[in-house]
Amino acid sequence: MTKIEKIVLSYSGGLDTSIILKWLQETYGCEVVTFTADLGQGEELEPARAKAEMSGVKDIRIVDLREEFVSDFVFPMLRANALYEGQYLLGSSIARPLIAKHLVGIAREVGADAVAHGATGKGNDQIRFELAVNALDPSIKVIAPWRQWNIRSRLQLSEYAEKHRIPVPSDKRGEAPFSIDANLLHTSTEGKSLENPAEVAPDHVYQRTVDPVDAPDTPEIITVGFERGDPVSVNGKAMTPAALLTELNGLGGRHGVGRLDLVENRFIGMKSRGIYETPGGTILLAAHRGIESITLDRAAAHLKDEIMPRYAELIYNGFWFAPEREMLQALIDHSQAFVSGEVTLRLYKGSASVISRASPCSLYSADLVTFEESTIAFDHHDAEGFIRLNGLRLRSWAARNGR
């Protein structure tokens, strides 16, 4: 077997990847480069640098990917109104292909033989990372420590950390923390008491949103502007993609928008329960649907609705770089040519409700739909022929069945 000389590790600075860093150094006896993607998770970045330095890492990469994350991954997904199993806004799923892209890029830059990740053998992320690497550079070896070492539990992980003097994190109450994944689109919380779906999630698991019960008693009215399917402004102020999502996270979070307690079906075959907070994404989904409602043709809108579950499943399962996802993306992007305008929403105690929408490209005609006298010629008698033709097969079916 060819000896591995250099590894690039996707590194968060959390317990798992801190232990993996040490394990890689001991097991392979080679240089390990750490790569930390700044996706808007916040506090983790500088501590990650310090921990990597303490472990003897010479090449530490912390890359600001916030704008690329939102513009090239979140917004294309938003154009599809993507929801996995009708609920999940794919906050973790959509981040993995971007991380993998830069993991591969750094590996090529530094001449690494392999990349490594901290995903467990039970989760979806191992699949997402490795399918992405397969699509981007099959020559790069992927090391998945959770599938190779003898550590089989969180207790054993803590024992390894203690043996090697790796700090074991705790939450504000001094307890072992939940498993948390955060980026500009969402925060997910899993593990511990949440593994029992019959147990109500404790209040302290929520980090980005207030309890809707405690949200302001006065609604807040906001406006989101769109150009060709992508959000470009909030309350009339143009913003970069990352700044826009950050702004909506703040607005939605204080009104308790975007909470989801979900049991989902993992690609690998088991069910899992997670708490998701996606305030900005929830607002954008409602707003995007609102602007599409007046700018998309009926058949085009219905076709988008039909392909959306397949598109969302491809992202969830790790096929972002697969040809079928790119084919669907081309169709979705083509549909957005006239999806421009403004949507006004009311944020109130956990809800983000569309209350008005306007577009220079609108297909909505008040003159055509009005109950009053119209200037547009529409003969009500034409509906009789329309109904008769559409009822033809039903009359034949009824006659056959003796109705």
Curated annotation (Swiss-Prot):
CDD domains: ASS. GO terms for molecular function: argininosuccinate synthase activity; ATP binding. Its main location: cytoplasm. It catalyses: L-citrulline + L-aspartate + ATP = 2-(N(omega)-L-arginino)succinate + AMP + diphosphate + H(+). L-citrulline binds at Y88, S93, N124, R128, S179, S188, E264, Y276. Pfam families: Arginosuc_syn_C (PF20979), Arginosuc_synth (PF00764). It is found in: Cytoplasm. Its EC number is 6.3.4.5. Keywords: Amino-acid biosynthesis, Arginine biosynthesis, ATP-binding, Cytoplasm, Ligase, Nucleotide-binding. This is Argininosuccinate synthase 1. It comes from Rhizobium johnstonii (strain DSM 114642 / LMG 32736 / 3841). The gene is argG1.
